[in-house]
Design a protein with these regions (language model features):
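Structural transition elements
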Residues: 219, 351-388, 405-406
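Detector for C-terminal structural segments
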Residues: 84-85, 225, 229-230, 308, ...
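Surface-exposed binding/hinge segments that line
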Residues: 111, 115, 156-202, 207-225
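N-terminal lobe/hinge region of extracytoplasmic solute-binding protein
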Residues: 63-114, 145, 214, 511, ...
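Alpha-helical secondary-structure segments
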Residues: 136-143, 170-172, 217-218, 256-261, ...
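Ligand-site clamp/hinge motif
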Residues: 240-294, 423
Length: 543
């Protein structure tokens, strides 16, 4: 048996703190403005430790750029929902450490069989839900199986296998093939494997979304006023894990919740977010545009943190319309200049070019397979492809959101595509509407989105045939399955390289490059966790 215990040594945690302070793989930087120093800022973000002897300001106000369509993480892949709820309201069987490895959270330990077909999780005892009930195997089985049904990547990984109860504090899943990568999927999925009560799994609205947000995390759901804010309140009966006073290892470890209330204020306009930070209306703001970073860095007592946060994706509609044709996707990919379209959105320095579908922090999975088809910026060749295949000038429909300047990408694409003879039609909506529109194949030929970092390629949602874009290709599915069913990590890496090389031919999407996310906060805040995002489990301002 392959044993994965819950034990985390102080030496490992200390190493993780150093790694976090240095920016991990080199894709993260923190700058303190006039009120602090670079060293102090790095130490603050690395430690993520609350002072139990201090008194903290009662509320933190966090200004975010958009509203989530739902807070049901089982069926919602939007980043903002995860940033609000994952690890805060809901926790998982396992989570990620600083090396992007799956380590216990709601389980004491887990075993992977030698053939990697069976995984057994041994649950922590005495963990309380926000409704006061104790977490048992019945809740975990209901939650995990609901997650599998709602998450195409998990479903394709496990096939017909589902979680089952062994006893009140043990669950397992057994497949007819290797599910080696499943723990990593649980730890870092874009649709988190949140554990809730069995009863909550049964209560859904007319859209199939959960209506009761009951978790085990250090904060409980309080209120959601549409288009205004989401409020979370500290759960005083939270049962922590890890060692009090020691820094977190990635997302794993002790959560003290020193702040009573976390309020996520929905503020679409960046200028309003920045102004609110300056006047201290907001303590933390998301989505600082790259061009505005120098100005925000110049504010008194403000810290700016930047990191490579994910990929910019141009997702084709494979089900219907002109982009369902392979030749057309190839022509579009051949003609586009990624520097031009990314500069339009992020400005210089706000992105990094790169053909790898994975991000810099996932060093094990980095590959240049298929890179010869990336950023060709060859409009003449694109014209030839269109002419050879009888393209007759059908309009190309681009769907985008007026979020973080993503609509600027659409305008830059329009100019480049029309130069090679492709007339375009741009539909610009808010983010919540885009997530609804992209479910309708009649509304777009391509939509523009971004994908946050994930620990394994299995979590790239667009490889699933049910994800909007509908890449229902037999060869793609075969190569994806080969990776997911590998019995060793080396086999999985080889299969991934083969999958990425084919993807740059088939084009489930165009990976335009990697975006840099900028956050800013009041430098008086202590205990922020900046591993692969921004998290508030130990964050607060001392009074």
């Amino acid at each position: 048996m392959r044993k994965n215990s819950a034990k985390v040594t102080a030496a490992v945690l200390a190493a993780a703190a150093v790694l976090s302070a240095c920016g991990g793989s080199g894709s993260s930087t923190t700058t303190a403005a006039a009120g602090g120093s670079d060293t102090a800022a790095a130490e603050t973000t690395a430690a993520a430790v609350a002072d139990e002897n201090a008194t903290y300001k009662e509320e933190l106000h966090i200004a975010v750029a958009q509203q989530a369509p739902s807070l049901d993480l089982h069926k919602n892949s939007t980043l903002i929902a995860r940033q609000m709820m994952d690890g805060t309201v809901w926790e998982k069987l396992v989570t990620q450490n600083a090396n992007a490895e799956a380590v216990p959270e709601l389980c004491e330990s887990y075993d992977v069989s030698e053939d990697a077909k069976t995984i057994t999780f041994y649950l922590r005892k005495g963990v309380k839900f926000h409704d006061g009930s104790e977490m048992t195997a019945d809740d975990v089985v209901a939650s995990m199986n609901r997650w599998i049904e709602g998450f195409s990547s998990a479903k394709s990984t496990v096939g017909d296998a589902r979680f089952e109860k062994v006893d009140d504090y043990t669950v397992k899943i057994t497949a007819d093939h290797s599910i080696l990568l499943l723990p990593s999927m649980i730890a870092g999925a874009a649709q988190p494997a949140a554990i809730t009560t069995a009863a909550a799994c049964e209560k859904e609205d007319s859209n199939g979304f959960m209506t009761d947000y009951i978790g085990t995390g250090p904060y409980k759901f309080s209120e959601w006023v549409q288009d205004q804010y989401v409020k979370l309140e500290r759960f005083d009966d939270y049962v922590p894990y890890g060692t009090k006073g020691e820094p977190m290892d990635g997302w794993a470890g002790y959560k003290a919740a020193p702040t009573k209330v976390l309020e996520f204020d929905i503020v679409p306009e960046e200028t309003t977010r920045v102004a609110g930070l300056e006047t201290e209306q907001y303590d933390i703001i998301y989505s600082v545009q790259n061009d505005d970073v120098p100005r925000v860095e110049g504010m008194d007592n403000v810290t700016v943190h930047s990191l490579q946060a994910g990929t910019i994706a141009l997702v084709f509609n494979h089900k219907k319309g002109i982009a369902a044709n392979q030749y057309f996707r190839t022509a579009v990919n051949t003609g586009l200049d990624m520097d031009e379209i990314l500069t339009a959105c992020y400005g210089e320095g706000g992105y990094e070019l790169g053909s790898c579908y994975m991000d810099a922090a996932q060093a094990f999975w980095n590959t240049d397979a298929g890179s010869e088809n990336y950023n060709q910026k060859d409009p003449e060749k694109a014209k030839e492809i269109l002419a050879e295949n009888g393209y007759n000038g059908e309009t190309f429909k681009i769907l985008c959101a007026n979020l973080n300047n993503m609509d600027y990408i659409a305008v830059a694409m329009e100019q480049e595509l029309e130069a090679i003879g492709i007339p375009t039609e741009i539909t610009t909506v808010d983010w919540a509407t885009l997530t609804d529109y992209r479910k309708d194949p009649d509304k777009f030929d391509l939509y523009i989105t971004s994908f946050a970092q994930v620990p394994v390629p299995s979590l790239k949602l667009y490889f699933g045939p049910n994800y909007p874009g509908w890449s229902d290709d037999a060869t793609l599915a075969e190569k994806f399955e080969a990776m997911n069913t590998a019995t060793t990590m080396d086999e999985a890496k080889t299969a991934w390289e083969d999958l990425q090389a084919y993807s740059w031919e088939y084009l489930p999407l165009i990976n335009a490059g990697h975006y840099i996310a900028n956050y800013a906060w009041n430098s008086d805040i202590e205990g922020l966790n900046t591993f692969s995002g921004l998290y508030f489990w130990n964050a607060g301002i001392k009074e």
